[in-house]
A protein has these predicted regions:
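C-terminal substrate-recognition/cap domain of FAD-linked oxidoreductases
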Residues: 2, 187-189, 195, 201-391, ...
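N-terminal flexible segment immediately upstream of the FAD-binding catalytic core
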Residues: 1-39, 44-77, 127, 200-203, ...
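N-terminal accessory segments
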Residues: 1-15, 37-42, 47, 284-306, ...
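Glycine-rich tight-turn/loop motif centered on a GG-T
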Residues: 17-21, 77, 330-332, 375-386, ...
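A glycine- and small-aliphatic-rich helix-loop capping segment at beta-alpha/alpha-beta transitions
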Residues: 54-69, 94-98, 120-131, 201-205, ...
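FAD-binding subdomain of flavoenzyme oxidoreductases
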Residues: 70-74, 82, 86-87, 91-235
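Activity-critical C-terminal alpha-helical subdomain
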Residues: 414-434
Length: 434
């Protein structure tokens, strides 16, 4: 799917006084200087796959990074322009027997956007988020000054410490702490401190063999019990959850999904040998999963088939929302692992009240980060869903959670920042931006 300059995947639409598509750093710097001279606000546009309206301008100038297309690979690293897509990096790395660990679901996302949001994806279960894999950034400041910073380069001003949530995934505000470096600061800042021009990221050797599976369960409770039991499995790179409404939502596209399945877990493991397959046979029997109806594979074709299954979940949810005449509506909250079930129950209690039968839950439950996808059929349901997001955000923070795990806040969710942080903690962030 492609988006124009004035919208993104969230469905939010904006307007701009001027649209700029610089071909190089010199043109970008000149445009920043001119915008600054006119005191025009600047919005940075990536690939448009974001879900929070971050790249949607509400006036001022829009600067698209689509022409920043550098892509150079070496052993253990890649140098990428902000306009290179995640798909392009994955494909190029694969040719050399390497891979880039972060894997946000939308592979057409620009690398600049994934850095701006500190994106993660399903493999974050093993590898963490984007920030961990960046070694160098080239950034244009609003003044037009270019910074070239490397991992470990000390920040040249006093950095206060801001309390951070206990959740494993967090991309809300600036993660201020003494000793942080420039890369820590710019990654996840959503372009509010500067524009990422290019980055050097770390690559890893491709595992010799991977085992992928989509495992079906007779109930949600059995699936969550299995999830808790499997979190410690050696070599597990992915542990994703799909609830019953989500399975039913994509059943037309995937008719082989067992009709009696009420939940599923999607796994990926680095294999050490056939004993790993035998171990999964035992695990399915021990946990009560569907042994004969679950799907496993070790080939590239199997892995791609399962990836498309996972991608079909948010894609189908978005299609339904658009078809019903609404923008996307969903959560990006992350809770401590031990609060998984409590938060899932809280979500369902409220969703069953305001939007019964019109929502589904799937995502990174292995990281305490499931996505509630709302599928409103009426304006009343959409309005209720918009309101309940604030209820969810407050509950998450009480549980030690993050109100923005990987999508960023953008314009749609900026209202959650004062829920995550008090004024006394937001003021130092404003000081850093100034």
């Amino acid at each position: 799917m492609s988006w124009g300059y004035l919208e993104d995947a969230s469905g939010i639409k904006g307007h701009a006084d001027r649209i700029c598509v610089p071909k190089n750093e010199s043109e970008l710097v000149a445009e920043l200087a001119e915008a600054s001279g006119q005191q025009a606000p600047v919005t940075v546009a990536g690939g448009g796959s974001g879900l929070t309206g971050g790249r949607v301008p509400f006036g001022g100038w829009l600067i698209s990074m689509e022409k920043f297309r550098r892509l150079d690979l070496d052993s253990g690293k890649a140098r990428v322009g902000a306009g290179i897509t995640l798909h392009e990096l994955h494909a190029a790395a694969k040719i050399g027997g390497q891979f880039y660990p972060p894997d946000p679901t939308e592979t057409m996302a620009f690398m600049g956007g994934t850095i701006a949001c500190n994106s993660s994806g399903s493999r974050s279960f093993m590898y963490g988020a984007t920030r961990r894999w960046i070694e160098r950034l080239r950034v244009a400041l609003p003044s037009g000054e270019i910074l070239d910073v490397h991992r470990g380069d000390a920040i040249d001003f006093d950095v206060p410490e801001i309390p951070q949530p206990a959740a494993r995934k967090h991309s809300c505000g600036y993660p201020l702490r003494p000793g942080m470096d420039w890369i820590d600061l710019f990654t996840g800042a959503e372009g509010t401190l500067g524009i990422v021009l290019e980055a050097e990221v770390r690559l890893l050797p491709t595992p010799r063999e991977l085992l992928n599976g989509i495992i079906f369960f007779p109930s949600d409770e059995v699936a969550l019990d299995a999830l808790d039991a499997w979190r410690s499995v050696t070599g597990l790179r992915m542990l994703e959850y799909v609830d019953d409404p989500a399975l039913r939502m994509i059943a037309q596209r995937y008719p082989d999904v067992p009709e009696t399945a009420k939940a599923a877990l999607i796994i990926e493991q680095i294999m050490e040998g056939d004993r790993d397959i035998d171990a999964w046979v035992d695990r399915l029997a021990e946990t009560g999963a569907f042994e004969e109806k679950s799907w496993f594979g070790t080939s590239d074709a199997d892995r791609e088939r399962f990836r498309k299954f996972r991608h079909a979940l948010p894609e189908t949810a978005l299609d339904i929302s658009v078809r019903n005449g609404f923008t996307s509506l969903g959560t990006d909250f992350s809770v401590p692992i031990e609060k998984n079930r409590e938060m899932l129950a809280f979500y369902r209690k409220h969703m069953d009240r305001i939007m019964p039968g019109h929502y589904c839950i799937f995502g990174h439950v292995g990281d305490g980060h499931p996505h509630v996808n709302m599928l409103p059929a009426t304006q009343a349901e959409f309005d209720a869903g918009s309101d309940v997001l604030t209820v969810f955000a407050r509950q998450c923070v009480q549980l030690g959670a993050s109100v923005a795990a990987e999508h960023g806040l953008g314009k749609r969710k900026a209202k959650f920042l004062p829920i995550q942080y008090s004024t006394v903690h937001i003021e130092p962030m404003k000081a850093v931006k100034r």
